[in-house]
Amino acid sequence: MGLDPPYLGGREAQLERFQDLLRNPHAARNLLVTGLRGVGKTVLLNRYSNAAEAAGWLVAEREFSEPDAEPANFAQTVLADLVRLTRKVSGGARVRSAAVRAAQAVLEHLGTLSVSHSGIEVGVRFQGASHTLRRLDDDLRDALEDVAGLCRHGRHPGIVLRYDEFQVVHERRGASTLSALLTAVGGAQQRSVPVILVLCGLPNLLENVAKAKSYSERMFIVERLGNLTAPEDRLALTEPAEKAARTFDEAVVAAVLRDTAGYPFFIQMYGDALWKGAAASVIGVEDLRRLRPRILHALDRGFFEARYARGSARERELLRLIARHGESATLRQLSADSGLMNNQLQPVISNMLRKGLIYRPSRATLAFTAPMFGAHIRRRGK
């Protein structure tokens, strides 16, 4: 996942909105990118990073994991990203010296860490207990200001924090993580610090952000990525082939778009398999008939199976019950199918939400985070 496709269709508006933020460093707006698996979120993030770096911005990138999201690790993770940004600052000896001082200042918030900076080993050890009284949002805001000060020395417009798979980060009782990051970025932006926060993840990211801070909707431009629609879905399949003097029979195009429902990753998988498996310059219906079982098998093994395997026995049973109804089901349907009350289902549902297997498109509905996952589960039962 996240490999750049030969054709990135239907995402021009999102790229242009990001370019607007780059052109206005003090706009105090951020981006929240969300969608199901396979819709091109990570590919779009890569384009964001390329655009920001081409414009001279300092970019910190990370794909968050569940260990990163643990309250004990979250502060270290984000602050370490800011330290690493100081190594990207361009300029002469004076700027490099300022970068070392900025790294030292950020490291003060970390307690113990050392990094190699322009050939100089910069490190800090915990000094005294007073540091523990500081709040994480204060540490993060101060660190952002320290690094942003370097941008002026190195003639960088600002900082981009670009975080993928961020749905794993959510507030936990007695621990501040997501709310601290939002407060720090918002506070820094109010002080005209040029920073853009880009958070990307599965649909439950929206709910996590809203719960963390009530004013979060004012901080973010929300980009909801879905399946491609006409004519972009067709172009995603045909344009790469046409550039190499290959074409698809119209019946093949219609069948592939029907099979894939316009989801970019699936279109890419079909196109790649048909391209490699068909000998003639025109890819025909017989090619699709011969290769389709192989394509579905590859999707099952390479895309769906690992997700299904993440579920426990009880969670897989609930996945199968959802699949009976298509790609989503209501709590009432699941309760009727399982014979369990809602309060008996909730612990299983909570675990599945945490694992990213399902999300809530509405209060009483559960849906798969991977498109066409229900069809995969139904194939498993045959």
Regions from the language model: what does each represent?
Residues R152-R155, I159-R162, Q167-K213:
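Sensor-1/coupling segment of RecA-like P-loop NTPase cores
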Residues M1-L31, Q189, M372:
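A short, basic N-terminal segment
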